[in-house]
Swiss-Prot record:
It comes from the Bacteria. F-type ATPases have 2 components, CF(1) - the catalytic core - and CF(0) - the membrane proton channel. CF(1) has five subunits: alpha(3), beta(3), gamma(1), delta(1), epsilon(1). CF(0) has three main subunits: a, b and c. GO terms for cellular component: plasma membrane; proton-transporting ATP synthase complex. PROSITE patterns: ATPASE_GAMMA (PS00153). Keywords: ATP synthesis, Cell membrane, CF(1), Hydrogen ion transport, Ion transport, Membrane, Transport. It comes from Streptococcus gordonii (strain Challis / ATCC 35105 / BCRC 15272 / CH1 / DL1 / V288). It is found in: Cell membrane. Produces ATP from ADP in the presence of a proton gradient across the membrane. The gamma chain is believed to be important in regulating ATPase activity and the flow of protons through the CF(0) complex. The gene is atpG. It is a peripheral membrane protein. This is ATP synthase gamma chain. CDD domains: F1-ATPase_gamma (cd12151).
Length: 293
């Protein structure tokens, strides 16, 4: 059945409206991405300073043959904790699918029995996905802002660290998409606890020798190490949000480009149908005139 000219015109108008919406959403995502990238950059400055301070402290700590902090010491792994970061909604391309696919593969390979891991979810997509497959998150956070403050995520971070300290699990990982650029992200599963990426050998020897402490190193580490773990988890959340905004921008750009192609194809279809209708009318007029002669 041939499509009428009015139907094609309505489809063109509808697609143009959709294109305007996706284009506006793309611009909003681009603005969010710029702010997220700035927040991530500022966090890296802070994190590098905290890391340097800790490596310097740990260098002296090691030199004094003192016992390492529990947050630095591995223990037999009976249960593993995961913080899984997804978005609250769709319209972000393959952003969520990448993380959730990796989680299913990880569960199948390392936790086939299903009773030796716990999941904490940031983002409704991940939480709903887990529940649909019979995995109950021990904690979930929804409605996170595009540039989340630490106060927004403090509860879930503190919950994860508290569970580790109470030995409800023996290691903690964060699963998220790392932002590379506006077109690319990398799925990462990074160990947060016990802390394994602080190397005392990277310490500044001159700084360490001249370091004067009012409290003991143990007391300072008791304060700094949990804060460092908190900051690393928070950094992963900022990174994931940046990747989410980039994915949203790219998805809306793709949708806008696709809409333009659909409009172009429909316009060609409309012109052909209109030309056929005009040709048919001319043919009928000529035939009618011939019949009157």
């Amino acid at each position: 059945m041939a499509v009428s000219l009015n139907d094609i015109k309505n489809k063109i108008a509808s697609t143009k409206n959709t294109s305007q919406i996706t284009n506006a959403m793309q611009m909003v995502s681009a603005a969010k991405l710029g702010k997220s990238e700035e927040a991530a950059k500022n966090f890296q400055i802070y994190a590098s300073k905290v890391r340097k301070l800790l490596t310097d402290l740990l260098h002296g700590h090691e030199a004094e043959n003192a016992k390492y902090h529990p947050m630095l010491t591995s223990r037999p792994v009976k249960k593993t904790g995961y913080i899984v970061i997804t978005s609250d909604r769709g319209l972000v391309g393959g952003y969520n699918a990448t993380i959730l696919k990796a989680m299913m593969e990880l569960k199948a390979e390392y936790h086939p029995m299903g009773d030796d891991f716990e999941i904490l979810c940031i983002g409704g997509v991940g939480a709903d996905f887990c529940r649909a497959r019979g995995v109950q998150p021990v904690y979930e956070l929804r409605g996170l802002a595009d540039q989340p403050s630490f106060d927004e995520v403090r509860k879930i971070i503190n919950k994860a660290i508290e569970m580790y300290q109470n030995e409800l699990f023996d290691e903690l990982y964060v699963c998220y998409n790392h932002h590379v650029n506006s077109l690319t992200s990398q799925m990462r599963i990074e160990q947060m606890l016990p802390i394994i990426d602080l190397d005392p050998n990277e310490a500044d020897e001159d700084y360490t020798v001249n370091l004067e402490l009012e409290s003991s190193r143990e007391a300072i580490l008791d304060q700094l190490l949990p804060q460092f773990a908190e900051s690393m988890i928070y950094g992963a959340i900022i990174d994931a949000k940046t990747a989410e905004n980039a994915a949203g921008m790219t998805a809306m750009q793709t949708a806008t480009d696709n809409a333009k192609k659909v409009i172009s194809d429909l316009t060609i279809q409309y012109n052909r149908a209109r030309q056929a209708a005009i040709t048919q009318e001319i043919t009928e007029i000529v035939a009618g005139a011939s019949a009157l002669e």
